[in-house]
Amino acid sequence: GKNYLATVPKYDGFCTVPNHLNYQKEIEGFLNLYEPIEHKPQQGEFSHIQSLMRHIFGEQYELGMDYMQLLYLQPTQKLPIVLLVSEERNTGKSTFLNFLKAVFENNVTFNTNEDFRSQFNSDWAGKLLIVVDEVLLNRREDSERLKNLSTTLSYKVEAKGKDRDEIAFFAKFVLCSNNEYLPVIIDAGETRYWVRKIDRLQSDDT
């Protein structure tokens, strides 16, 4: 038993440092809780991904590609809250969320509306992307919390039975809704949201 314990790595504590280009599991004696991703960019054709991106972002396709690039190259960069809305079915909204999960793997978490309202947030506070497939956060306090989270640099993590701990907060939000009119409260002049109305898919190739 003692011999085995001697082989177990020892750390001074934990950190959450996102980096997709030069990932480190240990940083100055601290265990990095951010997880590596297996994908490495390669030059070549990406017709299915391109088709999905063009469908989701339409005339803002280049901005959509910039968004993806910033997620990969500058994961701590603050970005707008993406809100995809459509009353129609089969629009590709959920497909886009699953695509983000496939690219960034365990650094993407699917939340429910209740997760945002819970005081316990340790399972999502250190993620790159927090996505919600059917968002309905139409209370004023929900809206204020979401806006604050999208711009804050630090956040207090709380888990059951543990003390609160303040960490760097870099998560981005991608929200989907079948409610085109009031999935979240957005005040006039608010610039923290990037709202896209998504059309029905012409085919299921994506």
Regions found by a protein language model. Give the residues of each.
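Long, basic/Gly/Ser/Thr-rich N-terminal segments
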Residues: 1-29
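P-loop NTPase catalytic core of nucleic-acid-dependent motor ATPases
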Residues: 20-129, 143, 194-197
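AAA+/SF3 P-loop NTPase mechanochemical coupling elements
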Residues: 120-125, 158-176
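Short glycine-/polar-rich loops that comprise or flank the Walker A/P-loop
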Residues: 125-128, 152, 169-172, 188-194
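Walker B catalytic acidic pair
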Residues: 133-135, 145
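Conserved ATPase-coupling elements of RecA-like P-loop NTPase cores
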Residues: 138-143, 185-186
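Conserved catalytic/switch belt of AAA+ P-loop NTPases
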Residues: 143-165
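A short helix-turn-beta junction within AAA+ P-loop NTPase domains corresponding to the substrate/partner-engaging
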Residues: 184-203
